[in-house]
């Protein structure tokens, strides 16, 4: 199955870069992408209010993947209309602080279309200041998002795309909260359910298992899942998707990025999602 045409594409992200919100949210997008890319550790990225602090915009260690080189990665981000001007400014600032040759990899990332990004990076690599220099523009990000569907759904929701068939568990919770006359905190749904909460987390840590919840109504079960993950494991919460249509289920089950898939329709193909030849998702 191909990519979902309703999810954010390169043009959507380029337009989003014009918004004030993107300045603080783009680093969060990068943090989520890195967190869901296998072989990436030591992630430290400032987002939202933290972007004004000095130092690198982000750091991480990579074992190497389809989208990242192997090594110590040092990130600079820019949502500016002129990505090359921002990249030059950031590169020059960092290069001045290098004594000898750095063993770090300089990575500039922009949600803009940057036609000359590859040639810019090649020229900078030839200077030999850093171990390597990379430049990622919106088209590289689009491909990366397609391989990390939980992040793809999240950013699509953030920029207002009318996604269907699935949504992040966090988005589902926010919709429920807005529709309630009385605001109920997430922890309300785990009150008196300590053993059940621990049991759910245990099941989600095992390969090839299906977590079955029984509740008086579907929303209660989903709210319980959200509250447990919110309290126990943000990383798992960011991978959790509520799937409402069989087509979306099949699409997500075929993806290589590990997900927590929560079906809210009848007779989902559980075996497809648990297929270890691709990626054993959690259900």
Positions of predicted regions on the chain:
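Mixed-charge (Asp/Glu-Lys/Arg
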Residues: 1-218, 255, 280-281
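Conserved P-loop NTPase "ATPase switch" module shared by AAA+ and STAND
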Residues: 215-220, 230-283
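Hydrophobic positions on the alpha1 helix immediately C-terminal to the Walker A/P-loop
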Residues: 223-224
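Active-site signature of alpha/beta-hydrolase-fold catalytic machinery across serine-
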Residues: 227
């Amino acid at each position: 199955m191909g990519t979902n045409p309703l999810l954010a594409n390169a043009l959507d992200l380029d337009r989003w870069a014009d918004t004030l919100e993107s300045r603080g949210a783009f680093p969060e997008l990068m943090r989520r992408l890195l967190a869901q890319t296998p072989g990436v550790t030591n992630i430290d990225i400032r987002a939202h209010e933290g972007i004004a602090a000095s130092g690198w915009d982000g750091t991480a260690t990579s074992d190497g993947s389809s989208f990242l080189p192997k090594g110590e990665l040092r990130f600079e981000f820019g949502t500016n209309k002129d990505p090359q001007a921002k990249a030059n400014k950031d590169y020059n600032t960092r290069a001045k602080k290098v004594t000898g040759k750095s063993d770090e990899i300089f990575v500039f990332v922009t949600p803009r279309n940057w036609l000359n990004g590859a040639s810019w990076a090649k020229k900078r690599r030839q200077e030999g200041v850093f171990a390597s220099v990379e430049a990622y523009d919106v088209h590289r990000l689009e491909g990366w998002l397609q391989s990390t569907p939980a992040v793809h759904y999240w950013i699509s929701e953030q920029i207002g795309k009318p996604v269907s068939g699935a949504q992040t568990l966090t988005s589902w919770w926010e919709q429920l909260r807005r529709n309630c006359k009385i605001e109920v905190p997430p922890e309300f749904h785990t009150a008196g359910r300590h053993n059940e909460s621990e049991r759910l987390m245990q099941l989600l840590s095992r390969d090839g298992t299906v977590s079955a919840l029984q509740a008086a109504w579907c929303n209660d079960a989903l709210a319980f899942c959200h509250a447990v993950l919110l309290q126990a494991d943000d990383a798992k919460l960011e991978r959790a998707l509520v799937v409402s249509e069989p087509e979306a289920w099949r699409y997500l089950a075929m993806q290589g990025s590990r997900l927590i898939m929560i079906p809210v329709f009848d007779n989902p193909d559980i075996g497809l999602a648990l297929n270890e030849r691709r990626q054993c998702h959690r259900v």
